[in-house]
Amino acid sequence: MEYSKINSIGELKDSGWESKSIKDELRDNLILSRKNNVNLFSQIHGYDETVIPDLERAILSKHDINFLGLRGQAKTKIARSLVSLLDEFIPVIKGSVLNDDPFNPISHYGKELVREEGDNTPITWLHRSERFTEKLATPDVTVPDLIGDVDPIKAANLKLSFSDFKVINYGLIPRSNRCIFVINEIPDLQPRIQVSLFNILQENDVQIRGFNFRMPLDIHFVFTANPEDYTNRGNIV
């Protein structure tokens, strides 16, 4: 497919491209790599009979993943290697901070643009190298950092009410829609922050300071944890 020639939703429909979730992407590409005898984890040594088979089963089952191990056991390296299982390029609505799927936008910006422009809605292509977000969990990480908050400066500049969805400044997790999102050292994340992730993991409910709306985020979550850390310094809720 010549991505550079497809610049609108109408052209995307004509190309025959089909939308799929990130977990389906990972699953389909893992199956394809196995059929072609391609080892995507060739740079990871010593885990061929332990970690890698479990990881592959988790991907095939479309599960989020938690790597538990001591320092230096390649937890983060394995997480980063999952990028190779993503499609090389995916289309997104141009200008969307949430990487909106042209056929199924979730942001209010994306929905309004598709409603106004229809098949003329402009799209751009996102490379798989840009679909990986990594956050180190530290005690000072807040809910607005991860999920988002109301931006009073934007509201004042645009003369908008605080009830307008346009005043929301989305955090790292919504901005990682259709991406792999890694939280390293999850025990260091405050328990109340971990609890705030439950709604996203289970129900896709995003709650931002007075806003309560369902946002079906399409994210593959990966967590890493050190058993020494979560017994001495923190815990996993």
Predicted regions span which residues?
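Conserved ASCE/P-loop NTPase catalytic core
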Residues: 2-236
